[in-house]
Amino acid sequence: MPSYLTRQKTRKIFSWVGRPLPDRKHNHQIYKEMRMKVNDCSTEIHIKVGQFVLIKGNNNAKPYVAKLIELFEDGSKFHSKKCARVQWCVRFSEIPISKRHLLGRKPAAQEIFWYDDPDCGNNICVETIIGPVQVVALAPDEVIPMDQKSEDTLFVKLSWNTKNFEPLSPEVLAALKKLEDSPKCQKPLEGKSKNVKNPSWNATEQMVKRIESSHSTSKSCQTSAHPVSPNARKPLELSDSDIPRKPNMRLSQKILCDSLDSQKNSKRKTAFSETASPPKRCQPGEIKNLSPLKTLEKNGQAHSFCDKGSMILRAQDPSFITTKISMERALDPVRSRLRPSVMLTSILTPKRTGREAGKQEAHTEPTRTSHRVHRRSSLLTLNRIRQQLWLLDDDKSDQEEEESISSAEVSDSTSEEEDDSIPSLLKRNSQPQSRNRRMASKPSLQTPSKTPKKTTHHPTPQIRGRNIAVQEPTSVLEEARLMLHVSAVPDSLPCREQEFQDIYSFVESKLLDGTGGCMYISGVPGTGKTATVNEVIRCLQQAAQTNDVPPFEYVDVNGMKLTEPHQVYVQILQKLTGQKATANHAAQLLAKRFCSQGSQQETTVLLVDELDLLWTSKQDVMYNLFDWPTHKGARLIVLAIANTMDLPERIMMNRVSSRLGLTRMSFQPYSHNQLKEILVSRLKHLKAFEDDAIQLVARKVAALSGDARRCLDICRRATEICELSHNHGNSLGPVTVSHLMEAIDEMFSSSYITAIKNCSLLEQGFLRAIIAEFRRSGLEEATFQQIYSQHVALCRMEGLPYPTMSETMAVCSNLGSCRLLLVEPSRNDLLLRVRLNVSQDDVLYALKEE
């Protein structure tokens, strides 16, 4: 649909029509009709009760749609206010993304849905009304017409009750059908214009203005001849309805001919003989005016432009395209109206140089012989040009060339009389054509590629399928490993009952009140913050399905997944509306959505995880997230999660921390009893661990960090170690304390220590040589030659064969690639400087013999 009046900064004046009916109960004055007048315009639009209107919203291109139920003036306040009670209709883009799949089909572009929600506010201010709109009601079995002439017509056939789509009730459908049959609500009533002119002169002036505005290079300077209401702004259409139908058409036709003939003295005259001379190129700064051109027939008579005229549009780009417009107007004796028939033909002419054009003109002047250019030859030339352009151009240019050829073929099927009256604009040039033929027939010297150059425009997206089904766990340890995974969703969330109840009560109260709020949740990693909030949202969604709480939209963003803090606006907007926009534009749209009072919008619950990663120097992202819920009428609930407990006091500005409010919650680290309860609830009835092993890992993790994720990872690693020991010959049994101790040592030890323990004997000997050289020299740096001498001495002491210089250099390079050593990036060989990337104590701890 085209853009509406909300983009135009004009002032509209609303006034009542008729006498009011008093409503003493509500202190209202009820009206049945109102008048809307745009400032500095004489056109008025009358809107009555029962009509559908467009109302200003967040998106100017897609305003809200509603049906007027009542017009009244509220006198309860100090200043009376013009108000209206409406019945809302929603577009498909206004429905939450998570519920759009319930429609089961692709909606039409002009389809709206009857909004069946009794809790939705239906009182608006009449100043937010843009104008009337036509809405057609359809039965469920009817098909939405696709060939509708008016783009402003909307169709409704289903209703939306915030849960699913249903057909319109018989009462609503009958009322809408009755409204369509009523003639008073079909079109807006416009007031009479102040300026009244002669009908014939109006018709002539409009046609002249339309011709000048459609062919002039300065279209912005042309103004309309008659005042048009800004509420009825539409794109210009070339149809029968654009030309006013007046009774005296012969007089207007005569005036049009006189006005066009009067311009011949000031404009360039061009006469075409049967052999057309090559047109001259226009200067870049020249304004090309169009004048009626006389066509000379064989008998020498010149026809008037009004009977049959042909205008040549010369493109400013002197390359290929010359557009020929032939306009015929015939008077219909039955309906007494002017019926224009417009024929557009695009002819491609090969580009000529100035020398060839001069020879052509010199050769044409003395001869004056008559030659007729056949359309078949022009089609052959077009085909050759198309073949060359197809090799050089992309798919878009190919489509344009096919359209030009199709238009030439259509013009070829016209009658002989029309073909004789059209002057010949295309002259064959044998030399360029022969060159083009040789170029087209010459084979390519490049090696043909095996893959095609052009890919399919609409590839079908597919998800990779599994060739083999997922194997079921074959042992108790495998099943326990699946249950202990961090991403596995448990049936219940133990040890966080109080925090769950506090968050649930906070969000539920905001949903019931229809207000916004913010809660700050902090705690060390692995204490169940995100899992608890997700469980709260899941329970609230189930309650919304049973009508225990109002429906809401849920959006979650994670600061860890964002490349830049301002991208959080883009993620929120895309998940809410499905639109893609830049960060600044998305911030403006979200501010308009949350800060303005949207009566029919659902409450939005926003979860912002890893809030501390959204910190910026100006802190504008955090400020906006905490400021939006504080606005009046903003139905936004923000749940912010961060790992820093004192984030508001430590890094936030005062203006940001004040917006955060006093609703805060802190998740304490898990104790050993809570960790043990979490492990038992995960394992359920499986006997995969000994009781002492579970007690040991719970106490170890609780003493260090209290991170439940770390506890689950240690238990999963212990099951792998237990299976590995079974493969070595031991009996398969539950995980013991020894298995857990080995897993704990791996988890809490450094990765460098683990890498040193897994090094080869030669690499460990090289590390010992580095430690010996550092102790000898007292420095933390040594050359490769010094370390090699120490390595050879250590090998002789232990009775091992010492490696060669090349083997030792390879060992040094390997340890440097593992980042255990800091090696100089040069080719100094023996003088290469080497340093340790870990402490000497860690190296000695990893190399000690157990």
UniProtKB/Swiss-Prot annotation:
Modification Phosphoserine occurs at: S259, S277, S291, S411
Positions that bind Mg(2+): D609, E610
Compositional bias annotation for Basic and acidic residues: 234-245, 353-368
TM region positions: none
Alphabetized CDD domains for the sequence: Cdc6_C
A GO BP entry: DNA replication initiation
Residue runs in coiled coils: none
SUPFAM superfamilies: P-loop containing nucleoside triphosphate hydrolases
Record site: Histone H4K20me2 binding: E94
Pfam families cross-referenced by the UniProt entry: AAA (PF00004), BAH (PF01426), Cdc6-ORC-like_ATPase_lid (PF22606), Cdc6_C (PF09079)
Signal peptide: none
Main subcellular localisation: nucleus
Binding, ATP: V489, G523, V524, P525, G526, T527, G528, K529, T530, A531, E610, N643, R709
Domain of life: Eukaryota
PTM notes: Phosphorylated during mitosis.
Phosphoprotein found in the keyword field: yes
Gene Ontology terms: cellular component: nuclear origin of replication recognition complex
Stretches for region Disordered: 209-286, 349-376, 393-469
Regions of compositional bias (Low complexity) in chain numbering: 214-224
Compositional bias (Acidic residues): 395-404
Molecular functions (GO terms): ATP binding; ATP hydrolysis activity; chromatin binding; DNA replication origin binding; metal ion binding
Family as reported in the entry's similarity comment: Belongs to the ORC1 family.
Assembly with partners or alone: Component of ORC, a complex composed of at least 6 subunits: ORC1, ORC2, ORC3, ORC4, ORC5 and ORC6. ORC is regulated in a cell-cycle dependent manner. It is sequentially assembled at the exit from anaphase of mitosis and disassembled as cells enter S phase. Interacts with CDC6 and KAT7/HBO1. Interacts with LRWD1 predominantly during the G1 phase and with less affinity during mitosis, when phosphorylated.
Domain notes: The BAH domain mediates binding to dimethylated histone H4 'Lys-20' (H4K20me2), which is enriched at replication origins.
Name under which the protein is recorded: Origin recognition complex subunit 1
Gene encoding the protein: ORC1
